[in-house]
Amino acid sequence: MLRWLTAGESHGPALMGIIEGVPAGVEITSGHIADSLARRRLGYGRGARMKFEQDVVTILGGVRHGVTQGGPVAVQVGNTEWPKWEQIMAPDPVDPELLADQARNAPLTRPRPGHADFTGMQKYGFDEARPVLERASARETATRVAMGTVAAQFLKHLGIELVSHTVSIASVSVPDGRPLPEPADVIALDADPLRCFDRETSDAMVAEVDAAHKEGETLGGVVEVLAYGLPPGLGSYVHWDRRLDSRLAAALMGIQAIKGVEVGDGFRTAARRGSAAHDEIVRDEDGRIVRASNRAGGIEGGMSIGDVLRVRAAMKPIATVPRALKTIDVSTGEPAKAHHQRSDVCAVPAAGVVAEAMVALVLAEAVTEKFGGDSVAETARNIKGYLDNIPASLDSIGQ
């Protein structure tokens, strides 16, 4: 069974993650993880923090000479800004006199709308928002990307590859019918300012971000994750919590600022007649069984069908708005403007990288559940044996 956990705070010394259940033989280095974290920092409209705060990756366990050993893999993502926060965020008690004159230690008593601040203070009994925002911060996704990189490397050994891209920023969207990016397109995608596969749309997105920046606004959008090379049968129809689409939706909804998820054509199918909503099963010109389309996004009945997996996640505009929204200062009870720390105008491209990591983690878990294997070679043999034993009358290929 594959499982993982993260720990750490936004301005703490480091973020940490442990992923257990990764078979032996997966090639993974700190360089792989650092490259993924660099992708997370990409995107037009990011804030100043992306420029001066670096991710320092250290693999602490489970890997020897660039190869997993079968034990838990532990990864630390160090924070180069830690010296500035060492006293404010120290785990051990600090002399109050040392903290008194530090501006960074000022109580955050004006909770920000759209964040976890206010309800977190209620739930955990805090009189200020610092303890809440330190853990609730999207900075935590750096560890998820690290864990997802390990999972993606495992999947890559099995011929499964993932791609994420931006399909909309605010009201600017990639037109329907445009080709989907493939694994060979990742370098070009990452070179685009907004990780958009359509150049004309990307230019319009850049203009939208510029306009929002001038107006002191923030923007959201939609990202899509594609998975190529999946075998049929991951997930199950037997119970709700074993359905692959259920697990993907939960994983994507767990990303900060994500407010909606769809699989395949998702919400658009609700406006169609039944005959135009599903994927007919036919024979192609070579006589092989295929689906005539992929409106389902590669999942039917809670199981992968062998076609390209396609899921989307909708990100709301960043809640830390430069213009500062109305709130209440909980120390005085008076109306106030919310705290405004530096923020991005748009972080949708980064959300795509995080979503890609979360999808990798879900798929890696589904693969280990279905096929097992103490080594990646054993997992690959098990997949081959499974596919070889599908009866000829049921054999199919992906689109």
Curated annotation (Swiss-Prot):
Name the top EC class: lyase
GO CC, alphabetical: cytosol
Q: Give the binding site residues for FMN.
A: 135-137, 256-257, 301, 316-320, 342
CDD domains listed in its UniProt record: Chorismate_synthase
Q: Which UniProt keywords apply?
A: Amino-acid biosynthesis, Aromatic amino acid biosynthesis, FAD, Flavoprotein, FMN, Lyase, NADP
What superkingdom heads the lineage?
Bacteria
Residues recorded as binding NADP(+), renumbered to this chain, are 40, 46
Cofactor binding note of this UniProt entry: Reduced FMN (FMNH(2)).
Catalytic activity, EC = 4.2.3.5
The entry describes its oligomerization and partners as: Homotetramer.
Its function? Answer: This reaction introduces a second double bond into the aromatic ring system.
Q: What is this protein called?
A: Chorismate synthase
Lineage of the organism? Bacteria, Bacillati, Actinomycetota, Actinomycetes, Micrococcales
